[in-house]
Amino acid sequence: MNNRVHQGHLARKRFGQNFLHDSSIIDAIVAAIHPQPGQAIVEIGPGLGALTEPVAERVDEMTVIELDRDLAARLASHPFLQSKLNIVQKDAMTVDFAALSAERGQPLRVFGNLPYNISTPLMFHLFSYTHAIRDMHFMLQKEVVNRLVDGPNGKAYGRLSVMAQYYCQIIPVLEVPPASFRPAPKVDSAVVRLVPYATLPFPVKDLSKLATLTSLAFNQRRKTLRNSLGNLFSAQQLAEQGIDATLRAENVSVELYCRLANVLAERTVSQD
């Protein structure tokens, strides 16, 4: 028996497909999402509809984004779902979520069992639309969830942690074992809730500066800030912002990275 075949569909490795089949896990995820009629519900990667069906039972309509044309066609001909679904057959990395929100006239509620091979870049894509998103619930590799939620001095704290926590409050929901999927992945999974801040706790004037800073710092995470950020700040300039130059990237809080990004932004403005 080919364990990559589920409900007659062969899971495609290039799309990172692993299909959820554990009913108790499905029920727990849908309860966490708590979809309601009238809300702008968007699912990324509905696959064979394990989450789509129970969510659709609770709403009048929803949008699904599915790259796999065979799965999109399957959903379009589904006897129960076809009348409720707006199917967008394209790569979620190319979707304008602000336009989707504008069409519905309200912020989106986004959820999905994200393919592990695109989960991090897809979240960075979604962060640029947080003004149009009410909340997000994602099934991810457990390691990625750890990176999302970890704080300074934590083993998993990194650039993803800083950028995600800049935009969103992040709440772990539940852990999911490999046996809950077909085919079973080689890693544990977890569900996480991301709620974009209505008011950013540490506003940054130029987000490109925060992106630059975190890339420089975490790409050389074993170096001290004196070395990794030495081309941008002297030890004295770091000290003026309350940062010890002998610290490493993982020791610096989101607030302090935002403070440094604003210093860089002000410096750029003064040079213009």
Swiss-Prot record:
Its main localization is cytoplasm
- EC number, UniProt record: 2.1.1.182
Q: Where in the cell is it found?
A: Cytoplasm
- Which Gene Ontology molecular function entries are recorded, alphabetically? 16S rRNA (adenine(1518)-N(6)/adenine(1519)-N(6))-dimethyltransferase activity; RNA binding
Q: Which InterPro entries match?
A: KsgA/Erm (IPR001737), rRNA_Ade_diMease-like_C (IPR023165), rRNA_Ade_Mease_Trfase_CS (IPR020596), rRNA_Ade_methylase_Trfase_N (IPR020598), rRNA_adenine_dimethylase (IPR011530), SAM-dependent_MTases_sf (IPR029063)
Q: Which residues bind S-adenosyl-L-methionine?
A: 18, 20, 45, 66, 91, 113
Which Pfam families does UniProt cross-reference here? RrnaAD
Q: Top enzyme class of this protein?
A: transferase
Q: Name one GO cellular component term.
A: cytosol
Keywords, ordered alphabetically: Cytoplasm, Methyltransferase, RNA-binding, rRNA processing, S-adenosyl-L-methionine, Transferase
Catalysis: reaction(s)? adenosine(1518)/adenosine(1519) in 16S rRNA + 4 S-adenosyl-L-methionine = N(6)-dimethyladenosine(1518)/N(6)-dimethyladenosine(1519) in 16S rRNA + 4 S-adenosyl-L-homocysteine + 4 H(+)
Q: Which SMART domains match?
A: rADc (SM00650)
**PANTHER family according to UniProt:** DIMETHYLADENOSINE TRANSFERASE, DIMETHYLADENOSINE TRANSFERASE-RELATED
* Family listed: Belongs to the class I-like SAM-binding methyltransferase superfamily. rRNA adenine N(6)-methyltransferase family. RsmA subfamily.
Function summary: Specifically dimethylates two adjacent adenosines (A1518 and A1519) in the loop of a conserved hairpin near the 3'-end of 16S rRNA in the 30S particle. May play a critical role in biogenesis of 30S subunits.
Q: What is this protein called?
A: Ribosomal RNA small subunit methyltransferase A
What species is given as this protein's source? Sodalis glossinidius (strain morsitans)
